Structure formats: structure tokens, C-alpha cells
């Protein structure tokens, strides 16, 4: 059974978030220091907390299965999807799709009008998922030094 929990600054699940973020980075096998990833792991709510952010953890039969986050960008009405991750053992249950839907709903509630994301070209299942939710390829909206980066955006949240 799937359960998605919105994480608050005082949530006991913050340690679960940290662990999921570390597993995400480990699976990517990329250096994320250009994104201040260490600081993000230390205090996820600084980047993804209220009033302009959101952070969710998915549980499958009460086992942590994945996460997703949202942060505000500098442009008015624009947010960014971050850290979509589902543990490999849970990838057959539609958890990634449910997390994306939860984040889109949160972005609407926070009155964002568009959402951006970046991903790696080699992550084709993720790109296909984003396309199913109306994300389109765009030019780079920030400098990402990793090879094979793909930038996407969805309007009208």
C-alpha cells in the first residue's frame, strides 16, 4: 500500500529524507557539489521547506520507497522539481508517477505557474515520465557542469 507523506520542518522523517537523498546521489554516480548537495542533505528544509517549497516521502507498506522535492526559482511563479528518486526494489509500483502527481498538486496549491527540472539524458524512463506529464525540452535555465543534462519545463500548473 502506497502512502505519501509531506515532510514538515519538525518531522521525524527528515532522517529518512537524508538517507533517500544519499541513495539518490549514490545511484547517479555524479558529483553534486555544484548544487551544495552536502548542505541540502544536512538541512533539506532550508531549500525545500515552507513557505515556497515542498518535500515528500513515499512509503510502500510503511517502508521508505522514494522522495521528491520542490523549490522556488528566482523568476516569479516558477518552481523546480528536485530529487525524484524511487528505490530500485519499488520501481514497479507507480511510485514515481504518484510522487510527480503529488508535487504537481503542491505546486498548484503554492500558486506556481510553471515548473522546471533538469535530468540526465541517460535517465530515459524519467524523461518519458516527465513527458507524460506535459514537460517539454527547453534551453538550459542554469549552468550544470554534468555531461548529458536535459532541461524541461511544464506550464500552467
What are these regions (language model features)?
Residues 93, 109-113:
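Short coil/turn segments at alpha/beta junctions that flank glycine-rich nucleotide-binding fingerprints
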Residues 98, 102, 124-125:
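Alpha-helical macromolecular-interaction surfaces
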Residues 5-82, 87-88, 100-102, 106, ...:
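Acetyl-CoA-dependent GNAT
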Residues 87-93, 121-122:
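Active-site acidic-Proline motif in GNAT/NAT acetyltransferases
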Residues 62, 66, 94-96, 134:
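Conserved phosphate-binding and hydrolysis motifs of nucleotide-dependent enzymes
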Residues 11-14, 93, 124:
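Loop/helix-junction capping segments adjacent to catalytic residues or to phosphate/diphosphate-binding pockets
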Residues 3, 113-116, 120-133, 137-157:
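C-terminal "cap" of GNAT-fold acetyltransferases
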